[in-house]
Amino acid sequence: MQSEKIAQLKAALQNFSASNSDLFDYALEEEKAKVRKRALLLLDQRARSVYELTNRLISADFDPNIVEYVVEDLVRANLLNDENFSREWVRQRRQRRGKSRQALTRELRDKGIKSEIIADVVGDIQPEDEQDIARELAYKKVRSLKKEPCDYPEYQKVLRRTVGVLARRGFSQSMALEIAREAIDARIDEIRR
């Protein structure tokens, strides 16, 4: 049995020697190294989804097959993980930008995240938290109001601007309108005192 294995190994070595090929494809490995270096530089700038990184590398004129291999390698090494990316993206965008569930879902979809991951990550957001964020944004916007609106058109102008701030962050029109009115009325009460 052992002699059979030795014979098979000798035959394999002779076939390899006869083929005059290298054990490694140096040109391919150099290309992979270039793509890997660029990928790591991009990931060093900020976290990215698999889709984003793949598109950036392909748009940099790298061979799509090599890009695919390098991206798979980064996923195996856990340097690229769509679920971790999504959770961190949602956390940061909610804290720093006050984005709604709807806006975050759209952003993650644009970044090529699978719908199951989006549902899981965005599903953790409670409706009460969403209202609190909208309320905070509305109160921040109306703080710039220095005097009470003198007439209905001026009130509508302030309302429109406040609703616009909330709408751009993806909050529903009904929620934005309700919270904007609440914030404006509270600010008017403060001004009157």
Swiss-Prot record:
Q: Which InterPro entries match?
A: RecX_HTH_1st, RecX_HTH_2nd, RecX_HTH_3rd, Regulatory_RecX, WH-like_DNA-bd_sf
The record's principal subcellular location, in a coarse class, is cytoplasm
Top-rank taxon of the source lineage equals Bacteria
What are the GO BP annotations of this UniProt entry?
A: regulation of DNA repair
User: Which cellular component appears as one GO term in the record?
Assistant: cytoplasm
Keywords on this record? Answer: Cytoplasm
Q: Reply yes or no: does the keyword Transport apply.
A: no
Q: Where in the cell is it found?
A: Cytoplasm
Q: Which residues form a coiled coil?
A: none
Recorded hits in HAMAP family, A to Z, give: RecX
Question: What's the family?
Answer: Belongs to the RecX family.
Q: What does this protein do?
A: Modulates RecA activity.
Q: Which NCBIfam families match?
A: PRK00117.4-3
The protein here is known as Regulatory protein RecX
